[in-house]
Amino acid sequence: MTTSMPDIANHTTAQTEGTLDWVGMSNIEMPIMVASKGESERMVSAHIDAFVNLKDAQAKGIHMSRLYLLIDELSTSNILNYQSLVSLLDGFISSHQELSDQAKVQFCFDYHLRRKSLISGKEGWKAYPVTLTGNLNQGKLTIELTIDVPYSSTCPCSAALARQLIQKAFQDKFAQQSELALTDVHDWLGTTEGIVATPHSQRSVAEVKVKLNSSINDFPITEIVDLVENSLKTPVQAAVKREDEQEFARLNGQNLMFCEDAARRLQHSLNQTDQFDDFWLRINHLESLHAHDAVSVTTKGIKDGYQP
């Protein structure tokens, strides 16, 4: 004798009536094949959040397994790009026709890129945290890409103070000499006595969020990373030889920046490209001098766009 299994979500009503903004699952772990412009398709280990709204005040609940199976189908049979993300959101809603008219999904993963060293030509892997978010609200679509890009920042104020101490050390060393030989100054500058102080610097992170449109299919992950690193000039390195470390020191010295400077550089660069409908960025200088971070936030500044 065949026994049918009870389906509580379909055949019972809510004990207390009410609509719900979002119902679903968070932190689903799945391998996902990602398409990034200019890169070969590659598998990433993603943490996924999937939700729909519950507009039927009397319905017991949504069908979470339907959301899960749609994501699993993407994982096993498709590639994550702009169009497949839109199709996934459509599937969330069509699988809950009487219950939902809104859907959202978020994929969080590290995207690894091969990055060349500054001088030696050596290469190494760097991992960039990426968040892809899709939201479909009564036919209105929003697709967002967020990337964290690490770099080094050296404090302009600290650099000025260090230069002052070096000047004083130079004066103390050579004040009594009426004539100076170039070799004496050259040799002195190569000692720890000559470089008596160095400015403080720290690893920093630029969080860049852009709003994408249908003109993009493969996600511009590498393009955004390149834009940030080329604008700020001091990217955190992977493989490093001594000549690379020396060049890194030079770049830091030639690109002194407060968090405000970094934010304005990226704001200018992002304003030069028209492929993003909107952008939001946050600069985080993880201070080595202070026990707090220095932060700057800015947006494209369009009407009804991102807010700081």
UniProtKB/Swiss-Prot annotation:
<comment type="similarity">
    <text>Belongs to the GTP cyclohydrolase IV family.</text>
</comment>
<keyword id="KW-0378">Hydrolase</keyword>
<dbReference type="GO" id="GO:0003934">
    <property type="term" value="F:GTP cyclohydrolase I activity"/>
</dbReference>
<protein>
    <recommendedName>
        <fullName>GTP cyclohydrolase FolE2</fullName>
        <ecNumber>3.5.4.16</ecNumber>
    </recommendedName>
</protein>
<comment type="function">
    <text>Converts GTP to 7,8-dihydroneopterin triphosphate.</text>
</comment>
<comment type="pathway">
    <text>Cofactor biosynthesis; 7,8-dihydroneopterin triphosphate biosynthesis; 7,8-dihydroneopterin triphosphate from GTP: step 1/1.</text>
</comment>
<dbReference type="Pfam" id="PF02649">
    <property type="entry name" value="GCHY-1"/>
</dbReference>
<dbReference type="InterPro" id="IPR003801">
    <property type="entry name" value="GTP_cyclohydrolase_FolE2/MptA"/>
</dbReference>
<dbReference type="GO" id="GO:0046654">
    <property type="term" value="P:tetrahydrofolate biosynthetic process"/>
</dbReference>
<feature type="site" description="May be catalytically important">
    <location>
        <position position="155"/>
    </location>
</feature>
<dbReference type="InterPro" id="IPR022838">
    <property type="entry name" value="GTP_cyclohydrolase_FolE2"/>
</dbReference>
